[in-house]
């Protein structure tokens, strides 16, 4: 299907380097998507949309996989991923819009996922099959046809969002086997086709600095992230012959969103090694909104510690202090793997709620002290 589409041609992204696979297309989370003027959708009554995706992450506002939608007029259809790994299907009938989500099965990060959306015009419902499981079904009444807008079809981008806005809705990961069929396949066939033969294949992503080697405007000597987004370098310490420093990172796109802890290490403070993310937010955990700024030290027992701001919009107040330390300092001298304490170590006391972050911790006279910025 993608052979009929054009890739975003914006010259602002002319230095992008796109990984290649024979069987799949890569979407970098901000500059790569595909589009075409649509015509065949106008005649579609019953149909099936099918694709396989291996996402690496999802932005806080969600990312589109398929979108031919005008939300102002409630026309068209969109299939999106939400930040909590659900598949969202939006149906527009013209003046009326219905939305439903995956329930029984959601998508996995870094693995192949098979998704099928089956619109049953005569029966009056829409099936959502995720990884061979009927994850949800929406009923809406028989013989209701989707009203398609006169908009292009986008693959990997939300049609309603400008590519330059802070929340871009651009898919990040691999995608393959995209099909749009002008018939509603049986649920048995959809499940049979979703065996996930390659579901055990881990699909890894490694940030790539090489695309910027010839960029005269990019610093070559000073510390800088391998790609996309960086702010607030913090938590420097020396341990086992290495200097460590961390920073606020977003591997999805060059915007402040879905903030995690990037990590660099060096023996001489000149030549730095990119390391995996030290901290990543987790759905359903105390830091699901983001792992924000903090500090680091080597404690009185000689163990490195990270103190960071745990953001969680489902809590009130929504900011608190969390703690993490390396999993194994002997087997992992570069401290690539960190484990979080199971509970928060400091929550906000009575006062102005909602601004309680950036803990700075130090040792003085054999005691630990902490300063926290607040409003």
Regions found by a protein language model. Give the residues of each.
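Beta-rich carbohydrate-recognition and catalytic domains
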Residues: 188-375
